[in-house]
Curated annotation (Swiss-Prot):
EC number: 2.6.1.16
Main location class: cytoplasm
Protein name, UniProt field: Glutamine--fructose-6-phosphate aminotransferase [isomerizing]
Described purpose of this protein according to its UniProt entry: Catalyzes the first step in hexosamine metabolism, converting fructose-6P into glucosamine-6P using glutamine as a nitrogen source.
Gene: glmS
Length: 610
């Protein structure tokens, strides 16, 4: 699974398909392939292990022609990274690419083998190719064959099929894995992400759950899950395909804050269905490894460390598995004891953080059961050297102060926690569904949270002339306070500290005065009453409070305490949600102070030296 591109045109489509794959490279992949058929029904399939450039060179050398084609970048889930496991897969005249996980692939494989089909690869995708080929023997069209096949597939998928004997059309089915159709003039396209098509069209249609669409040069016909023909909205996109262009935004950081809803959708794509987490989508052999884990050790730096600190509460509260979190530069120099059946998790946006990479190499010598990384950059050292990788797919992040990398790490960690609890039988189906539904709701909720921008911009003026700021939180909101503190100091150069609110009496309370803003992250939960007592301690000593809480929390503002009332969201994802106003606050304080938001002094995006 990873990236899909398809095209039906009068002109040769090889260049369009390969360029589309280039635009999807940020999503992570280990192999790439393309299949193109010309008007005389001659089909050329080329697959390569490695970079899209290697595929591009092979396509150029072969001088591939043809107006109908599909292409794919693969991140291995079923079957090792290899050319034979790379997409597209074929069965007779049928060629298929696929994103996602077919959960009943073993059952279908046995059925197909009983019918005489021979499998060349280890992938679940080849099952789809054979199923479509089988159904086409009795179906009236490729469309009908794909519809019949889709009804037999279980899991999250987006799949595209092409028939060599009929090069005038391709058929796509969507269930849990996004598919967008692009409209041209006398040509039409499809992809798993509109970014792949922005160089050929700006008009897009997004398929809905259960849709199957037939695409020709001149028409796109969509059928819903019941088989009824339906119309889907066509929209004009103003998205920027170049990550190096700030577009309408003043800074990359602001742009990347606003990209978070889409980034979260990308992170979740193919990894959750309507009510469950797809464990195999996390990595090769993930289900087997997670079923044996007795302890989790997270190692990271900076923002990624704060994400790990947040996830520690989830591992213990949701999955019932002990979890330690260590700063990589400390972990690697400590004489630690490896617990039995321990899983090492490294977190890094770049995948090249020197201390984290060194910690991984050290840990592999110390008997960890397995090492995985949660990372945003495919092909990075952490990805290559870990046993398996969970790519966040946040897209290129240019601003030094991480935003979308943090929230996508958190969503990836929450999916991992849920999968771990699921594989060990520690969470119920009902709890799994509750978590997944909260994740599905998160992108829209964050989009709504961004509407607080003007209110927070006005609030930022209170901080711009201060020299210090204190952030407080309890439970998983303590590391969210840590992340808020880090953001403020990174880009505004204001000294900021974060404390677990219960630690106030143990020192920080001595700092409280009218010149010390105190920001409190205070959603409604079982620690709220304890947090309220800490708020009163600050209030009694003349501190100026800024409390971010939902209406149910029951705070009443006055001249010493400003309440920023947030919508109520699920407790499960509230830590991710409350990150957004903290990012906006830091951004606008820095803007008022006139600092270099995207490239703050003394800092680099990726710390590749010790």
């Amino acid at each position: 699974m990873c990236g899909i591109v398809g095209a039906v045109a009068q002109r040769d489509v090889a260049e369009i398909l390969v360029e589309g794959l280039r635009r999807l490279e940020y999503r992570g992949y280990d192999s790439a392939g393309v299949a193109i058929v010309d008007a005389e029904a001659n089909l050329t399939r080329i697959r390569r292990l490695g970079k899209v450039q290697e595929l591009a060179d092979a396509v150029d050398e072969a001088k591939v022609v043809g107006g109908t084609g599909i292409a794919h970048t693969r991140w291995a889930t079923h079957g090792e990274p290899s050319e034979i496991n790379a997409h597209p897969h074929m069965s007779g005249d049928i060629t298929v690419v696929h994103n996602g996980i077919i959960e009943n692939h073993e059952e279908l494989r046995e059925l197909l083998q009983s019918r005489g089909y021979v499998f060349e690869s280890q992938t679940d995708t080849e099952v789809i190719a054979h199923m479509v080929e089988w159904e086409l023997r009795t179906a009236e069209s490729l469309l009908e064959a794909v519809q019949k096949t889709a009804k037999q597939l279980e899991g999250a998928y987006g799949t595209v099929a092409m028939d060599r004997k009929d090069p005038s059309r391709i058929v796509v089915a969507r269930s849990g894995s996004p598919i967008v159709i692009g409209f041209g003039v006398g040509e039409n396209f499809l992809a798993s992400d509109q970014l792949a098509l922005l160089n050929v069209t700006r008009r897009f249609m997004y398929l809905e759950e259960g849709d199957v669409a037939e695409i020709t040069r001149r028409d796109v016909t969509v059928f819903d899950v019941t088989g009824e023909r339906v119309e889907r909205e066509i929209t004009e996109s103003n998205a920027e395909h170049d990550a190096g262009d700030k577009g309408q935004y003043r800074h990359f950081m602001q742009k990347e804050i606003y990209e978070q809803p889409k980034a979260l959708i990308n992170t979740m794509e193919g990894r959750i269905t309507a009510d469950s987490v797809v464990t195999d989508a996390i990595g090769v052999h993930a289900a087997d490894i997670l079923s044996k884990v007795e302890h989790v050790q997270i190692v990271a730096c900076g923002t990624s460390y704060n994400a790990g600190m947040t996830a520690r509460y989830w591992f213990e509260d949701i999955a019932g598995v002990s979890c330690d979190v260590e700063i990589a530069s400390e972990f690697r120099y400590r004489k630690f004891v490896t617990r039995p059946n321990s899983l090492l998790i490294t977190l890094s946006q770049s995948g090249e953080t020197a201390d984290t990479l060194a910690a991984l190499r050290l840990a592999k010598e110390k008997g960890y059961m397995a090492a995985m990384t949660i990372c945003n950059v495919a092909g990075s050292s952490l990805v290559r050297e870990s046993d398996f990788a969970f790519m966040t797919r946040a897209g290129v992040e240019i601003g030094v102060a991480s935003t979308k990398a943090f929230t996508t790490q958190l969503s990836a960690l929450l999916m991992l926690v849920t999968a771990l609890g699921k594989e060990q039988g520690r969470i119920s189906k009902e709890k799994e569904k509750e978590i997944v539904e909260a994740l599905h709701a998160l992108p829209k909720q964050i989009n709504a949270a961004l509407s607080f921008e003007k209110e927070i911009e006005a609030l930022a003026t209170d901080f711009a002339d201060k020299h210090h700021t204190l952030f407080l939180g309890r439970g998983e909101f303590y590391p969210i306070a840590m992340e808020a503190s880090l953001k403020l100091k990174e880009i505004s150069y204001i000294h900021a500290e974060a404390y677990a609110a219960g630690e106030l009496k143990h020192g920080p309370l001595a700092l409280i005065d009218a010149d010390m803003p105190v920001v409190v992250v205070a959603p409604s939960n079982d620690l709220l009453e304890k947090l309220k007592s800490n708020v009163e301690e600050v209030r009694a000593r003349g501190g100026l409070l800024y409390v971010f809480a939902d209406a149910d929390a029951g705070f009443e503002g006055d001249e010493t305490m400003k309440i920023i009332t947030m919508p109520h969201v699920s407790e499960i994802t509230a830590a991710i949600y409350y990150t957004i106003p903290m990012q906006l606050l830091s951004y606008y304080v820095a803007l008022i102070k006139g600092t270099d938001v995207d490239q703050p002094r003394n800092l680099a995006k990726a710390v590749t030296v010790e």
